Amino acid sequence: MKRLKYIFYFYCLFIVFINTAHSESYSLEKAFDGLNRPWGMSFIDDHNLLVTQKSGEILKINLKTQEKIELDHNLKVLEVGWQGGMLDVLFHEGMVYVSYTEKRYGKHTTTSIAAGKLVNDRLENFKNIFRSDPPVDTDIHWGSRLAVKDNYLFASVGERAQGMAAQDPTNHFGTIIRLNLDGSIPKSNPGLTTNKDWLPEIYQIGVRNPQGMAVSPIDNEVYITNHGPKGGDFFGKVSKGSNYGWMLVAWGGTDYDGSIIGDGSAWKPGLLKPIYRWIPSIAVSNMIFYQGERFPELNNKVLVTSLKAQKLISLDYKNDKV
């Protein structure tokens, strides 16, 4: 769990002011400087980590020596608007996984995932293992966070501003997908078992733009943080074959002009209910479950970053309640 300590430490570099639910105060120490719009990070060991920059770079950084190496790749990364580009990165057992905005044709793009082996500061056999479909010409809501649980790769795919398309499991809009680590499709996925009308990669539907994802070291479940519209950001569990309901519901939020979404309900029977919601929105970004020695008061807490408030928020989550 030492690595989680460093992850928490590094996330603090990008936060101007930190606050928790208990109003604790923390001082920051700069670990590395000179990054250009960093988006994702993943530790290789105690000193080395991978960092993505939205403009398309994958960097290997040594915090001890301050050395920075750019890893070559041939991905068609397109930095779109203020959300798209090279996004998350995950290092797992020698493999590097990245999610990114891929230019497919014209201005049409998708959330895609590539993987390859890291060997002597080189990415070998680095190629796409997933491309969300269909490509669309919008510049928001990519999702794209990555996590590994039980040798499965989980990834979030935003609904790309396609609204009710998040209720149509014959496309990838507004979904959580699950792959084997080599990119193949698990035979136990809903589309191959209980939900035969779903695309085979899809594990869960009905999300809007999940930019946070983490596996809990306590119960070994996958959790997400999801952007609502004007209100309705939430923290919740990833559950096989379930539906969070976007945009039948908006989790307590409204459209940006103040109009209701669906019938105005925050939740309906038959849909998966978020564990915790923020109204008004805080613009939730990434999250971790903290376990470490440096901040014992935060042990087993859920730490959530807020883009809007530029704060780090601590949730005391136990027994499916906050």
Predicted regions and their residues:
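Beta-propeller domain segments
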Residues: 84-86, 159-322
